[in-house]
Amino acid sequence: MVAVPARYASTRLPGKPLQLIGDRPMIQHVAERALAAGAREVWVATDDARIAEAIQGLAGVRVAMTSSVHLSGTDRLAECARIAGWDAATCVVNLQGDEPFAPAAGIRAVAQVLQRSGAEMATLAAPVDSAHDLFDPNVVKLVRNAHGDALYFSRAPIPWHRDSFAAQRDAVPAGNHWLRHIGIYAYRAGFLQQFAAMPPGTLERIESLEQLRVLEAGYRIAVALTPEQFPPGIDTPEDLQRAQAQLASA
């Protein structure tokens, strides 16, 4: 299953799911990427009838009308899972509603990582390729253990290369030690309910990163490198303009 949380309200880009990219709203592009990945079912979890209407009639896509009081996409998807009646063992991929160019290979990969790892949750990462991204707090970094599980996620440049960063911070040091997190997740429907029911942890509150709740509670998050480049999501009017230009030039 692929589930897409989508809300109309957005501080930086109001009505984001309905913004047009080409001749189709963003939420339709996202749903089509999930279908291209071979998802058995695609669900859009929303609290807004306008979003539901935008994908009405799209073959293979269903809508779960959820509460308007959810604080996160995870909470919204947990309600979606209850509405859909998914078995606790069902694999659910959480694809963000602002990822209209998400590669199908990446969507499949995160589900495969969950299935083969035995972890409670799975996600993807990609090498950091610029100093700007390395030191940008809006680009989340992560470190893994020898088994490929996440040790920590941070807005800081981790691991901190003491010697290299003391000398300069305008290039990524050699060694391929730095990974940026790609915000796509997979979990079993049963664990999704557990996750949503957990109280926010101290680390989550400090970093404003929801996935830290899982690590702080002692659960595993398996991390694999994305098999294909994941374009950045759309958060601002400038991001939307770039996406529109990208589609127009394709």
UniProtKB/Swiss-Prot annotation:
Cited CDD domains = CMP-KDO-Synthetase
Q: Is Cell cycle among this UniProt entry's keywords?
A: no
Reactions catalysed, as given in the entry: 3-deoxy-alpha-D-manno-oct-2-ulosonate + CTP = CMP-3-deoxy-beta-D-manno-octulosonate + diphosphate
Pathway listed for it is: Nucleotide-sugar biosynthesis; CMP-3-deoxy-D-manno-octulosonate biosynthesis; CMP-3-deoxy-D-manno-octulosonate from 3-deoxy-D-manno-octulosonate and CTP: step 1/1; Bacterial outer membrane biogenesis; lipopolysaccharide biosynthesis
Q: Where in the cell is it found?
A: Cytoplasm
Q: Which Gene Ontology BP terms does the record give?
A: CMP-keto-3-deoxy-D-manno-octulosonic acid biosynthetic process; lipopolysaccharide biosynthetic process
Q: Might you give the EC number(s) for this enzyme?
A: 2.7.7.38
Using the UniProt record, give the first listed, main subcellular location: cytoplasm
The record's annotation in NCBIfam families points to:
kdsB, PRK05450.1-5, PRK13368.1
Q: Which family does it belong to?
A: Belongs to the KdsB family.
- For this entry, the protein name equals 3-deoxy-manno-octulosonate cytidylyltransferase
Protein's organism: Xanthomonas campestris pv. campestris (strain ATCC 33913 / DSM 3586 / NCPPB 528 / LMG 568 / P 25)
